[in-house]
Amino acid sequence: MYRFLSLRRMTTVLFVAVALSPIIATGAHAANTDLRRDVEVKLVETQRKAAPDLKVGKATCPAALSKPVAKLGSGIHRCAVVVEGVSVPYDVTLRMGGLVKGGSYTVQNAKAVIDTKKLVGIASTVVDNPKTAKISCGASRVVLVAPGATLKCTVVEGEATETLTFVVKDLRGMVSLST
């Protein structure tokens, strides 16, 4: 099946994270501060720490998060942060209590965020001649996928072309090479 791939080395890539580290951040929020701004700042800061080599842009949250905390109540809101030009969705879970008339929140990515440059790096570990093979896992640097989805990389070496299929295992971006 894999004409120029080393089957011996394929087992080394079976559960490797290629995602930007998923954001699982927490924050506390007092009743008289702007929750929307707090969350947007936290999203950008945490994303920059998780992926310092990627361009992280502006974060946006719904206007509803600008309401007084007491009127928001507990619940989940969808925010987004731009990474390499791609709008990456995040779920913000609000929990009331914990602070005087305030609350707390957690932020987690809603989809696996795959860095295709890292995926190319993993694919290069299973080809026999990584220096001469041309590997492409798509034009976009960042790809959003749900767990269970597949990502394909094309490997070209001389006249031979092969497709590698990776299965995304979870929101952390763990992938396995489908054989």
Predicted regions and their residues:
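Extracellularly exposed regions in secreted/surface proteins, prominently low-complexity, repeat-rich
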Residues: 146-179
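Sec/Tat signal peptide C-region and signal peptidase I cleavage site
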Residues: 24-30
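Serine/threonine-rich, repeat-prone extracellular segments and beta-strand-based repeat modules
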Residues: 56-78, 134-152
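Short, non-transmembrane alpha-helical segments in secretory-pathway proteins
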Residues: 31-61, 111-138
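Bacterial N-terminal signal peptides that target proteins for export
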Residues: 2-14
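Bacterial N-terminal signal peptides
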Residues: 13-22
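A short, surface-exposed interaction/processing loop segment used at functional sites
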Residues: 99-116, 173-179
